[in-house]
Amino acid sequence: MKHSEGFLRLVNDAKTRVKQIDVAGYLALRASGAPHLLVDTREESEWAAGHVAGAIHLGKGIIERDIETRVPDHAATLVLYCGGGYRSALVADNLQKMGYTSAISLDGGWRALKESGVELE
């Protein structure tokens, strides 16, 4: 999908402020046993079509409204993914503004996760 210039400017600006992790880094985090939550920020229809086993779903349209109910610990490590790493960067930026100190955007998103061989549902 080709993204608009305005959207890419917004995403690139957010990426200057957020921590990102690639799939290899996420798999290492997961293998280490370090506590974290994997959060799928895609739309409901994307989630229903398939997602990473064990992930929770909080779509980009509602995550800021619902995150504090679902994850009240602002120090929790949140690894956020979307389709390719754009929307998750925007979400990570907003969560940091809300006081979440370890919101991480997964670069490559769902596409990279599928290619990695992680268990899907």
Q: Residues of each region from the PLM?
A:
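Rhodanese-like catalytic fold shared by cysteine-dependent sulfurtransferases
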Residues: 1-37, 41-77, 83-121
